[in-house]
Amino acid sequence: MTMLAVNNLIAGHGLLTAVRDVSFDVEAGEVLGVIGANGAGKTTLFRTLAGVHSANSGSIALDGVDVTALSASRRVAGGIAMVPEGRRLFVDMTVRENLQVAGENGRSGAWTLSTVLAALPVLTSLLNVVTGGLSGGQRQAVAIGRALMSNPKVLLLDEVSLGLSPVAIEGLYEQLAGLKGRGDTAMIVVEQDLDRAMAFSDRVICMLEGRIALEGRPRVLGKPAITEAYFGLTHPESTHA
């Protein structure tokens, strides 16, 4: 079942077009990895999907419903949640308060405080801790938990491992693997680590200068082809596998 369908999306900042004619689908329970060098358009794509940026043209459909013109808050209510680069938590509030705020502004569903804590047990002992005092890995777990509290159909994870220690990254991806195993939420993950992206994703798209340069299943594409697309060594037309 297609959970998110993006068709011929064009978006940017002012006169700069950062996303150029991008199209892809994501199924329920599927993980789509988005890779590409800095400036490839990944973050603008995510912010456009979440409603933070407006699309210049093209369409975004969530579970069959066109959400292209909806505000960010209405997309959250409809089922799109983003874990942004840099976490952007309420640092003067406790973990519990951060989670509860998200729960009050999202959809009703299976994700509650108790189910989020079961999925992300690292948060259980941190509920009454002010978020500003947490480590990077702990903050990232809170950011993911906050997104889950809105009961998303599609979870956008932008640079989830950025700035984390290797140990924190391992712990984070163990938790994400648990979420993936549930099979009820589509995930789109921006990840700079190619090996990590290939191992965790069911499919990957590699962006180059705002376009999709390569798309397919990691094991079929192979790391050499993905690396070439990442650095712009392949023909700029989209390639599928």
Where are these regions (language model features)?
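ABC ATPase C-loop
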Residues: 147-148
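Helix-to-loop junction immediately C-terminal to a conserved catalytic motif
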Residues: 50
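ABC ATPase NBD coupling module
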Residues: 54, 66-87, 113, 125-128, ...
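The feature captures the beta-strand-to-loop junction immediately N-terminal to the Walker
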Residues: 35-37
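Conserved ABC ATPase signature
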Residues: 130-134
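Conserved ABC transporter NBD signature motif
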Residues: 58-65, 78, 111-112, 118, ...
